[in-house]
Amino acid sequence: MRIVLGEIFGLKIYSYGFMIGLGIICATLLFLKRGTQRGYNEDKLFNATILTVISGILGGKILYIITEWKTVMQDPSLIFRDFGNGFVIYGAIIGGALGIALCSLKNKWNVLELADLVVPGLALAQGFGRIGCLLAGCCYGAETTSSIGIIFPADSLAPAGVPLYPTQIFSSIFDFALGLFLLWYGNKNKEKGKTMSMYMIIYSIGRFFVEFLRNDPRGSVGLLSTSQFISIFILIGGILLYNINKLKGRKETGEK
């Protein structure tokens, strides 16, 4: 567990940013492969990826600022001084979703089909990101006396010297498993929006429950953490999306 992996030409390589970057690369390659297999133009898909990544990063940073408003107001330079850290994943997802919607509108793509192509890679990227969380010590769990507890070093972002629930490991395993499941499910079910809805349903449920084991400062809405509060709406949206054709009384089977 280490915040800084090393230096290249005097530039520090942060473990969190490195794993996020690795996840984005893997997600992009998977998205391009699946998209071209469906007949999409590779250059347009790559441009869409750039926009989606940028909007996702901005969304993650904006929600971080909102949830940590008091801390940011005390030291606004945190926003720019440590831009590689301090992100909220739900903000990144929402920002990325807006990017996908804009790309779909511009290229006259079906937004649900494009989202179906994105989410398997997104889940896998989240898995890499949680490894980054483990290395940096952020998103840590509550204290535990169980044998599964992990102890972070003194230079970690997590409290040192006490066993904590390995919430980063739980989340990483969950995200990787979800990504593999979505790849399998997307190949079996080509109905537009189904893979996206499964991501929304499964991820929101998993995220809601793992939040009970976390103990890092991350904002709250009443008795719920910010992520638990958002998870409720993501879950409802996923259920509605999954049943959208039933609600409309018809099944969409048209080609893009």
UniProtKB/Swiss-Prot annotation:
Its EC number is 2.5.1.145. GO terms for molecular function: phosphatidylglycerol-prolipoprotein diacylglyceryl transferase activity. The chain crosses the membrane at residues 11-31, 46-66, 83-103, 142-162, 164-184, 221-241. Keywords: Cell membrane, Membrane, Transferase, Transmembrane, Transmembrane helix. It is found in: Cell membrane. InterPro entries: Lgt. The keyword Nucleus does not apply. One of its GO terms (biological process) is lipoprotein biosynthetic process. This is Phosphatidylglycerol--prolipoprotein diacylglyceryl transferase 2. It comes from Clostridium perfringens (strain 13 / Type A). The lineage of its organism: Bacteria, Bacillati, Bacillota, Clostridia, Eubacteriales. The gene is lgt2.
